[in-house]
Amino acid sequence: MNRDTRLYLAWLVALAATLGSLYFSEIRHFNPCPLCWAQRIFMYPLAVILGIAAFVGDHGVRRYVLPLAALGLGFAIFQNLETWGFVQSIKACTVNAAAACNTPWPVWGTSQDTLNRALTIPVLSMIAFALILALLSWPRQRVTVPESAAVQG
C-alpha cells in the first residue's frame, strides 16, 4: 500500500468518524459527554486536514495529524476503561446524568443487544483513532535500484 492510499484511507476514516459522531448527536439525539467532546475536538479537524492533504498529496501532514490522533486515542482509551469499570469516573463525567461518560451508547438497536455491549461509540472512536495512527505511521518502503541497472541508466 503506497503513501497516497494510506493518506486517503486515513481521511476516509476521519470523515466517517466525524459524520458518525454528528449522526449520533444530531439525528439519534445522543448527548455527548465531556470525554466525547474531547474526542470530537481531535477528530473533526482530522477530517478537514487529512482531506486537504490527501487531495494535494501533502505527506508532511503527518507531523500535524499524528499528535491530534494520539491525543484523541488517549481520551478514547480512558473513556473505554471508564465504561468497562477499570478506572473511576472523573468528576466532569458525573455532573450531568444525561451525558455520563460511562454510558454504553448503542451503535444500533438497544443497549441490551449483545453486540452493542461490546461495540459502543467510544470503542468505534478508539478504533478510528488507532486506524488513523496505524495508517500514517506505517513505515515508508524505499525502492532500491540494483547497481547494474543504475550503471546502465
From Swiss-Prot:
It is found in: Cell membrane. GO terms for cellular component: plasma membrane. It holds the Pfam family DsbB. One of its GO terms (molecular function) is protein-disulfide reductase activity. The keyword Nucleotide-binding does not apply. Disulfide bonds join 33-36, 93-101. SUPFAM superfamilies: DsbB-like (SSF158442). Keywords: Cell membrane, Chaperone, Disulfide bond, Electron transport, Membrane, Oxidoreductase, Redox-active center, Transmembrane, Transmembrane helix, Transport. The chain crosses the membrane at residues 4-23, 38-57, 64-81, 117-139. One of its GO terms (biological process) is protein folding. It is a multi-pass membrane protein. The keyword Nuclease does not apply. Required for disulfide bond formation in some proteins. Belongs to the DsbB family. BdbC subfamily. This is Probable disulfide formation protein. It comes from Deinococcus radiodurans (strain ATCC 13939 / DSM 20539 / JCM 16871 / CCUG 27074 / LMG 4051 / NBRC 15346 / NCIMB 9279 / VKM B-1422 / R1).
